[in-house]
């Protein structure tokens, strides 16, 4: 069959141009006679790959000179532990904002290592909005937010003022979807499998003053940021091929206008889909308008009966898949459907989805 439109929350679709480029180099990377998959991470052929990926991150995200960039393993979930282990060393206290499943998991993990205060939460309305916070104050080692919430489809449309408290952000599902002022944060991290590349590599950008050789007692060597910043992501064998693909994606982003180009592309897609949902008599978006994500769009039908709604949702996703629109099922905690429209999703995918939604509505409501 032909290529489908993949609306998965992650791993997600990659630019077709990048996939073809990788395919062309699969058996022979730049005349080396081998695939990057087979290459030693200590070889002269691989070192430029990781250096280029780092340089492209610094260029596209305008990362200041006093920040280090590393490619790690373990996904964003490992960062839930690395952050408190490395940053929670002065007062042993941190402050989090709870905006959904992923910030909730981060809070649960952090409590093993530091005392956690929750500055605000949107749990009261099933995480369908981002709380308004004027300023976060207190004697904390760091403050933590999840900038974009894939499951509930919400996004911070402002950066909270934390004063001198280093701000940490999980930007896994929105990295390079639009410009971001990295200097407003002490540390940001992103699992690659949504907007940067395939699963298996995690990008961390950390300010120099937060890199310590004295993390919490008992912190494993592999969970110490300095271990990796000192060795330029090559302390141990990195996910070589994943980093290689990330580099390709970063060059694709640059070719398509960089972060500003991605912003224009993504807002066009999101506005088209939200406008359709807001004008529909059958479908509705679940996130508050002032908190909506341009990356993840959960939606429900007007069916109120739970059993009937569940049947309708299953029928929708099954028929959508037959039409070449895959991975549209909503998260089990939300139900309904979810369209993840990351950087690589073309506007044509959104148009095809809307056409299908119209047809499905006409036939079932």
Identify the meaning behind each predicted range.
Residues 283-320:
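Conserved PLP-binding catalytic core of the aspartate aminotransferase-like
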Residues 77-143:
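PLP-dependent aminotransferase-like
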Residues 2-4, 322, 331-365:
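PLP-dependent enzyme catalytic core of the Aspartate aminotransferase-like
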Residues 10, 110, 121-175:
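Active-site phosphate-binding strand-loop segment of PLP-dependent enzymes
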Residues 3-54:
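A glycine-/small-polar-enriched, mobile loop at the entrance of the PLP active site in fold-type I
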Residues 15, 187, 192-274, 288, ...:
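Active-site C-terminal subdomain of aminotransferase-like
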Residues 32-79, 100-101, 109:
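Conserved N-terminal alpha-helix of the aminotransferase class I/II PLP-enzyme fold
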